[in-house]
């Protein structure tokens, strides 16, 4: 079940975040794999009941064990040319590399979609994915995501 992380999930979430960071470092070499990608003070801020507006960490459990996580937040459009709406942004998502391709990510995404729609009143979910990460892009498309924007980076 997908739920807001607890303080006792600190090490498990950081272990998964290290896996994700190591994977992404192949496309973003300046990423540094550190012991705690989410330091304790940041982690604690992300697990407060009202943290969804800033940064919230949700975990997926199987038999009591953390097998996946997401760092997410809500934001509202603030435009004079479009309708006001609430959007859920996924900043990080990871499933234990030993358990990938077993449907855990699909379950996480389905449960997150239900929360976004029913609990938080979101009109959409957005995320960014590294362009060379073809397996992630295919997974997100399978979940119903469509390319909307193309981000670009100029390395200095």
Name each model-derived stretch:
Residues 1-16, 24-26:
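A short beta-loop-alpha structural element at the N-terminal edge
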Residues 22-45:
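Conserved GNAT-fold acetyl-CoA-binding loop/helix
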Residues 42-59:
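A short helix-loop-beta-strand connector motif used in the catalytic cores of GNAT acetyltransferases and
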Residues 59, 65-74, 89, 94:
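Conserved beta-strand in the GNAT
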Residues 83-97, 153:
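Conserved acetyl-CoA binding element of GNAT-fold acetyltransferases
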Residues 99, 103-111:
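Conserved acetyl-CoA pyrophosphate-binding loop and the N-cap/start of the following alpha-helix
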Residues 106, 131-149:
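Conserved active-site alpha-helix within GNAT-family acetyltransferase domains
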Residues 111-112, 122-136, 153-156:
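Conserved beta-strand-loop-alpha-helix junction that forms the acyl-donor binding cleft
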């Amino acid at each position: 079940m997908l739920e807001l992380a607890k303080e006792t999930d600190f090490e498990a979430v950081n272990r998964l975040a290290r896996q994700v960071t190591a994977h992404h470092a192949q496309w973003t070499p300046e990423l540094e794999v550190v012991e705690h990608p989410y330091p304790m003070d940041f982690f604690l801020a992300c697990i407060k009941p009202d943290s969804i507006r800033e940064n919230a960490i949700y975990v997926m459990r199987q038999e009591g064990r953390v097998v996946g996580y997401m760092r997410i937040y809500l934001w509202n459009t603030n435009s004079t040319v479009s309708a006001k709406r609430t959007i859920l942004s996924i900043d990080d998502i990871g499933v234990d590399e030993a358990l990938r391709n077993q449907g855990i990510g699909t379950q996480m995404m389905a449960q997150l979609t239900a929360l976004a729609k029913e609990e938080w009143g979101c009109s959409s979910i957005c995320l960014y994915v590294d362009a060379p990460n073809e397996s992630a892009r295919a997974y997100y498309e399978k979940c119903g995501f469509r390319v909307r924007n193309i981000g670009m980076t100029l390395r200095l």
